Amino acid sequence: MSDDIKKGLLGIIVDETEISKVMPEINSLTYRGYAAQDLCSRCNFEEVAYLILNKELPNKKQLKEFKKELSKEITLSKNLISILKKIPKNSHPMDVARTAVSVMGLEDKETKDNSPKANLRKAIRIFAKTPTALAAFYRLRKGKKIIAPKKKFSFSENFFHMCFGKVPNKEIVKAFDVSLILYAEHSFNVSTFTARTITSSLSDIHGAITGAIASLKGPLHGGANEEVMHMMKKIKKPENALKWITKALKNKDVVMGFGHRVYKSGDSRVPTMREYFKRVAIIKKDKIFEKIYDIVEKVMIEEKNIYPNVDYPTGPTYHLMGFDTDFFTPIFVISRITGWSAHIMEQHAANKLIRPLASYKGSKHRKVIQLNQR
């Protein structure tokens, strides 16, 4: 293979962005210039969503208006609810998320309008409605009635309310908020680049986000948090962890939740999420997965010099919160919609069709032989 070919676009800078900056050399991630860790400690998710979409943190008046807009758009159409009821209960929620956003695109009167203001309005609608759609399916597949959102609740509180019919204590809601903030944006990852590529053809925001959701579903991207939990469930208890991870490494199995294409000495989001994983484990009085976490992490670092990524602590945190494992990546979706939307709008603002080249390595020119002579 020629040195000119960069498989996976590794190391290739394809564009500029003002949205986020990943700095592996100093183990840092910023959104619009603000450190993600600082945003986690000082802001709620709605504030960070506003920042990503509008370039600045909101003041009290702006935040109140933003929440009002979300509240206005949070309900689903009767048509979408009807479709959700017809979806097979064994469908993966990521496929449901993709379908729901597609339907939103069919229903949105501004679908064809790619102006900045229209795209922002559509982004807010998708951001508000997607959690409602996912929570509705969460209950429908269990044979339960859909729970309507309540205006008095925050973004995170409403999601718990719509899924479980109750809101947990503030510490768990804060942990969920933190996970959403850490998942909200991460520069030109696979799903974001997918969204920008679709946008570069001047397609609409619903189509771009639908494509991004399909990309995020893969276990090498967003689906890793689900795979982490499947791994921990296989291990079952801390006493099995060392034997399990030793065997996995001997067999050269892929250990999900470890390694990153950008971070090589540790994901900057992990320490913050690890702390909230610990807090949730204490509240739930369940330290089994935390102990498994520590044993597997220690072996991976010592034996392979590979560090965990943010999916590693997030998976068991969502499990302790009560979410089904196949809902972990959809939670990622409801957060990352903010980042995708910002990138879609940024792509429109200075667009150029994304069209890379390929180095052909197939057969040389061949003469076509008639069918009866082959």
Region locations from a protein language model:
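Non-transmembrane, aqueous-exposed alpha-helical and coiled segments at domain scale
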Residues: 1-374
